[in-house]
Amino acid sequence: MDEKIETRLIGATMQSNEPDLERSIRPKRLSDYIGQAAVREQMDIFIRAATNRREALDHVLIFGPPGLGKTTLAHIIAHEMQAGLKQTSGPVLEKAGDLAALLTNLEPHDVLFIDEIHRLNPAIEEVLYPALEDFQLDIIIGEGPSARSIKLDLPPFTLVGATTRAGLLTSPLRDRFGIVQRLEFYRIPDLIHIVKRAAHILNVVIDENGAGEIARRSRGTPRIANRLLRRVRDFAEVRANGMINESIAKEALDLLNVDIRGLDVMDRKLLETIIKKFQGGPVGIESLAAAISEERGTIEDVIEPYLIQEGFILRTPRGRIATELTYQHFKLPLPTQSTLQENFDLLGKVE
């Protein structure tokens, strides 16, 4: 992926310098896990019940957009179960032996966390099925005619799988999770709480309005909120007395080109192109990609999802259309109905 996409300030994927920072502010207990009230309440019940029965927790699948706390929740599950945690990711497990090495080193009730579980090799999945259902591992010893299969008993353990693409999981794998949790984008009050908690851990002085300004521009995502907090902290230390209030946060985020709705330069460029070059749309994806000099995949996978989710653009069979919200955001007059109809007719002829 393009380097500028990977280092996008409001990108939800983790950047190379962030793992240690995220670990330092990650909550360890379910009671400290902010937001996701339904998920938190359900997991509290499931964990208490399993603990009281002295059993391993059922296997857990956590899915949702990046940056919402899937890894954090996996760590909390292990901590609350007073169990060890082994962590890996789907792409890292290249052969059956890699998975076998992890499984045979688990202690009773341990948690095995597999991030990006939708990217597991199908051959690895086949090894995983009996381990999940029967806590047994089938291993092939030898090669050719002399090869034989032996079964190893595994201690009861909990698999926690995390994915941003639940639809890519195979049905047999998905069906083996007893607990499935979907993480939603966060509300502003929860993000304010998250920003204030991170500020306290990082020894940053911030008031309620300053936290609110950061939260509103964080696209409903804690990872982005914490990243913006660190950048605003830099600004406050250099340009002010180190304290973050509403005006300091606003000035810093404006300087960073993150507007009040969390849109950055790439978002605004795409929206303004639809409005100014294509009269609000509809515009085909290939034409749009050429107009803003971006790859089609970048638009579809990186830029568009948040804009569609927030209602800035509509994706129709005829192409992308800027909504009324987009015109309001840029303080531009709405196009007439006749202009929109002409655009539809023109695109239909081109296609």
Curated annotation (Swiss-Prot):
Residues that hold Mg(2+) according to the record: T71
Which pairs are disulfide-linked? none
Q: Name one GO biological process term.
A: DNA recombination
Where it mainly occurs, coarsely classed, is cytoplasm
Binding-site residues, DNA: R296, R315, R320
The subcellular localization recorded is:
Cytoplasm
- In this chain, ATP is annotated as bound at I25, R26, G67, K70, T71, T72, E133, D134, F135, R176, Y186, R223
Q: Which GO terms describe its molecular function?
A: ATP binding; ATP hydrolysis activity; four-way junction DNA binding; four-way junction helicase activity
Highest taxon of the lineage: Bacteria
SMART domains registered for this protein in UniProt? AAA
Region of interest (Head domain (RuvB-H)), residue spans? 260-351
UniProt xrefs under SUPFAM superfamilies: P-loop containing nucleoside triphosphate hydrolases (SSF52540), Winged helix' DNA-binding domain (SSF46785)
Q: Which GO terms describe its cellular component?
A: cytoplasm; Holliday junction resolvase complex
Key words of the record:
ATP-binding, Cytoplasm, DNA damage, DNA recombination, DNA repair, DNA-binding, Hydrolase, Nucleotide-binding
Stretches for region Small ATPAse domain (RuvB-S): 187-257
Question: What's the catalysed reaction?
Answer: ATP + H2O = ADP + phosphate + H(+)
Region ranges (Large ATPase domain (RuvB-L)): 1-186
Which EC number(s) are documented for this chain? Answer: 3.6.4.-
Please describe what this protein does. The RuvA-RuvB-RuvC complex processes Holliday junction (HJ) DNA during genetic recombination and DNA repair, while the RuvA-RuvB complex plays an important role in the rescue of blocked DNA replication forks via replication fork reversal (RFR). RuvA specifically binds to HJ cruciform DNA, conferring on it an open structure. The RuvB hexamer acts as an ATP-dependent pump, pulling dsDNA into and through the RuvAB complex. RuvB forms 2 homohexamers on either side of HJ DNA bound by 1 or 2 RuvA tetramers; 4 subunits per hexamer contact DNA at a time.
Domain text from the record?
Has 3 domains, the large (RuvB-L) and small ATPase (RuvB-S) domains and the C-terminal head (RuvB-H) domain. The head domain binds DNA, while the ATPase domains jointly bind ATP, ADP or are empty depending on the state of the subunit in the translocation cycle. During a single DNA translocation step the structure of each domain remains the same, but their relative positions change.
Quaternary data: Homohexamer. Forms an RuvA(8)-RuvB(12)-Holliday junction (HJ) complex. HJ DNA is sandwiched between 2 RuvA tetramers; dsDNA enters through RuvA and exits via RuvB. An RuvB hexamer assembles on each DNA strand where it exits the tetramer. Each RuvB hexamer is contacted by two RuvA subunits (via domain III) on 2 adjacent RuvB subunits; this complex drives branch migration. In the full resolvosome a probable DNA-RuvA(4)-RuvB(12)-RuvC(2) complex forms which resolves the HJ.
Q: Which family does it belong to?
A: Belongs to the RuvB family.
Q: Which HAMAP family does the entry mention? A: DNA_HJ_migration_RuvB
Entry protein name: Holliday junction branch migration complex subunit RuvB
